[in-house]
């Protein structure tokens, strides 16, 4: 059900009429696909990258926000709180790494306490439970490494941390299992109204072949490019600005420096630089917030990374920045209205936007999926899918098992005793599972996002060749076709004796 080339697409009936075509396989598009798969609907997801979770969804703060920052009455406020509420059940059913570690918005000596009081008022209005302002004595007992300048903080116990890769993969895999077709390496070039449906012309980025889709309903979940697709079919133009955020990821030795997610008072550019543990035990610092013209500008900068350390120190002291193991940047899709843009386009019947999904987009994704599905119900006759499977198991992690369980597993499946990634203790069996499960990995980064092989201290310096050998054997595919992250990122280009 996951196709990566036009030849496979033809075999799967890519010229068929779909009830629903979703553009974008990030967390929002994948969540919508999963929600729609609860119904008897012929749906597909069209994604230009070689894998799901390859845009904003792979480069963000990995936070499930409480919902106290959004302006009451906005979609951000409503959908953040609902999405937060849904996370416990989703994490259980779809095996998503998720933890309610709570969040703190700190106020320093040179800041007005009224900022926290306004956030408390907003959060209460939005229906966020358990909010309270706590003073320094209690704060330091909770977080000993807070800056000496911190005087008080807003505590949100429902705030959490999640793995955005696994969250997106879980939605996508479950949707795929329930019959949604995913077309990867498929770039949308044009969308045109064609009677009662839409004609979507695409280019396969790997083969350069062109293909056409027809769909009664189109859902636009294309991140920073959502305005481009909206503006193809509507006179009600959107303008989305790419807002770049740079991050530093620290080694697991630094992962206990804080236990809660530490925010600073938000500004018009966002929630500011945070310091947070991750569900996998690292420490994350970021993001910056700089508007850029280039919707592909995911490069990091020396000035941006330098500013992170200085800004983060205002809330948390002694951050061991020498333990940074990697840095990265992501783009948030900021729409001029400063709110999510979700709904059927007035002058383009059957075209539904899920646009402008910046923070708290990850937190809101499950609720956005519900909202969009309700809109589709008003356009198409949807009946419940009697065969819907609502659960999914993630990749088995031998290092979470007891010694007795691990020995039994290795005796039955020896590949789980062969360590490939020493930093993260990832086995050959886990990588094989990542390749063979629905929407299986076909690149080094695809394996990395599913298993964490290559995410540790050496950043794939040791395990890359061994992971490539497993990809070559299990897909199977030529070593020359294996990429880091899709078209144009091939690892091996020739034999050394021939160069």
Locate the predicted segments by residue.
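Iron-sulfur (Fe-S) cluster-binding segments and ferredoxin-like electron-carrier domains
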Residues: 296, 427-438, 461-479
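Flavin-dependent oxidoreductases
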Residues: 31, 191-196, 200-286, 290-301, ...
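Short beta-strand to alpha-helix junction loop
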Residues: 78-81, 106-115, 155-173, 183, ...
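Glycine-rich FAD pyrophosphate-binding loop
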Residues: 38-58
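Dinucleotide-binding Rossmann-like beta1-alpha1 core, especially the glycine-rich loop
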Residues: 62-142, 272-273
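C-terminal catalytic lobe of FAD-dependent flavoproteins
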Residues: 270, 279-280, 296-419, 426-439, ...
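N-terminal Rossmann-like FAD-binding beta1-loop-alpha1 element of flavoenzymes
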Residues: 18-44
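Helical element adjacent to the flavin cofactor pocket in flavoenzyme catalytic cores
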Residues: 154-216
């Amino acid at each position: 059900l996951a196709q990566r080339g036009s030849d496979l697409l033809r075999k799967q009936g890519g010229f068929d009429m779909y009830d629903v075509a979703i553009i974008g396989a990030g967390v929002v598009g994948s969540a919508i696909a999963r929600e729609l798969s609860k119904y008897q609907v012929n749906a597909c997801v069209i994604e230009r990258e070689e894998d799901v979770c390859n845009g904003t969804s792979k480069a963000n703060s990995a936070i499930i926000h409480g919902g106290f920052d959004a302006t009451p009455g906005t979609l951000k406020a409503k959908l953040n709180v609902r999405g937060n509420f849904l996370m416990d059940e989703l994490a259980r059913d779809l095996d998503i790494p998720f933890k309610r570690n709570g969040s703190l918005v700190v106020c320093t000596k040179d800041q007005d306490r009224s900022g926290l009081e306004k956030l408390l008022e907003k959060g209460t209005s939005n229906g966020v439970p358990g909010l309270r302002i706590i003073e320094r004595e209690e704060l330091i007992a909770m977080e000993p490494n807070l800056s000496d300048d911190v005087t008080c903080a807003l505590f949100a116990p429902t705030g959490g941390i999640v793995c955005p890769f696994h969250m997106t993969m879980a939605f996508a895999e479950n949707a795929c299992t329930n019959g949604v077709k995913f077309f990867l390496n498929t770039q949308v070039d044009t969308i045109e109204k064609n009677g009662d449906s839409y004609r979507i012309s695409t280019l396969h980025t790997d083969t350069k072949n062109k293909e056409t889709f027809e769909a009664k309903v189109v859902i636009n979940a294309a991140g920073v490019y959502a305005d481009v697709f909206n503006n193809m079919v509507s006179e009600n133009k959107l303008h989305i600005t790419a807002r770049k955020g740079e991050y530093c990821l620290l080694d697991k030795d630094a992962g206990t420096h804080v236990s809660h997610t530490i925010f600073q008072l938000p500004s018009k550019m966002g929630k500011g630089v945070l310091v947070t543990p991750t569900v996998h035990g690292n420490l994350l610092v970021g993001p910056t917030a700089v508007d850029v013209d280039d919707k592909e500008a995911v490069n990091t900068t020396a000035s941006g990374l330098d500013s992170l350390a200085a800004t983060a120190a205002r809330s948390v002291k002694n951050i061991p920045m020498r333990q940074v193991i990697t840095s990265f940047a992501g783009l948030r899709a900021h729409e001029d209205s400063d709110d999510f843009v979700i709904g059927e386009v007035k002058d383009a019947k059957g075209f539904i936007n899920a646009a402008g999904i910046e923070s708290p987009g990850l937190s809101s994704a499950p609720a956005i999926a519900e909202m969009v599905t309700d809109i589709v119900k008003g356009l198409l006759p949807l009946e419940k899918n009697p065969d819907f499977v609502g659960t999914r198991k993630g990749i088995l992690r031998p290092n979470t098992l007891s010694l007795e369980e691990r020995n039994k597993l290795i005796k039955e499946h020896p590949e789980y005793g062969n360590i490939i990634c020493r930093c993260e203790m990832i086995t050959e069996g886990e990588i094989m599972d990542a390749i063979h499960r629905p929407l299986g990995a076909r690149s080094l980064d695809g394996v990395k996002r599913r298993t964490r092989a290559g995410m540790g201290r050496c950043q794939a310096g040791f395990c890359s060749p061994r992971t490539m050998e497993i990809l070559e054997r299990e897909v199977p595919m030529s070593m020359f076709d294996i990429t880091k992250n899709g078209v144009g990122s091939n690892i091996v280009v020739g034999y050394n004796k021939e160069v």
